[in-house]
Amino acid sequence: MRAHVLLASTLTLAACNGSTSPGPDASGPPHDANVDAYRPPLPDSGPGSGVVVAGCRILPQDNPWNQDVSALPLHPRHAQIMANISPTTHLHADWGAWTDGYGIPWSSGSGAPNAHMDFVDYPDESDMRPCDGVPFCYPIPSTARIEGGPASNPGDGDRHLLYLDTTGAPNDCTLYEMWNTNGFTAGTWSASNGAIFHLGSNALRTESWTSADAAGLPIMPGLVRYDEVMAGEIRHAVRFTLQHAFNHHIHPATHDGPSSTADMPLYGLRFRLRADFDMHAMDPHTQTILRAMQRYGLFFADQGSNWYITGDSDDRWNDGDLIGTINGDFRNVTGGDFEILDTGSQI
């Protein structure tokens, strides 16, 4: 959830909250030849391999999402900002089973035909990809999953749609993300907006533009994904939400929040779990997530509940009540256990 501040722009990318049409049925991954991987393979582990999902490298290794921040200095306003972001609130794992409607699902595949896009709220901040005389055509199959689970309806929550086009794998895949997705009818997807991320590039969105996330960031690179946790290593920063956002931002974010109150957190602000945080008594899967927070940190990406960590939508999170175990451990991790990092000047 987020409060959107729409800034005027002359270009075209995409934006924010969530609305529309029921996703595929709950019987499992949609049966579509164009959707070939709802669950990624175990990530590569070789040196310099970067993050690999469904055969695609998720952004270059030197991208901010993949940056080791364990040695970065603290933000000069660390104490003042921390006082405004509920430092006594514990973390919450905001993900879980697809059939229960938890987490943000993603789909992947190649060869899907172009579908027309009807961006009803923010077409001026949505990425153009013209075909058939219309400005927006994305190769997203009709069976791509929508956030909220198989029983969700338009207007229920944020209804993000994330589609990884594996054409060009491993180094030149394309990520399509939409917010407030109403559904697919007669060859057309309807959503509030759409963003395209070329995963072989470190290019940022147009300055002042939002995306499917309020900050103008991609969502998929920051998800806690089931397969990574089970493999015992997450090699990227993690997405999370806070209640308030300042009306400036810091790269790689490109969009401002609505608050003019001094020392509120900015979109794109980077956080890091303290190196001396004691996690030895926690479940090994929880430790995998927390170690990533120490090495790669977290990005503040959207307004929502304080200290909600975002993960993927996968029924396997319910195996042995894994998500319950992680959330039990997260009750012993609070906002005050994190450090705010100095990654550049606000814009």
Describe the role of every protein-language-model region.
Residues M1-S49:
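Ser/Thr-rich, Pro/Gly/Ala-heavy low-complexity intrinsically disordered linkers and tails
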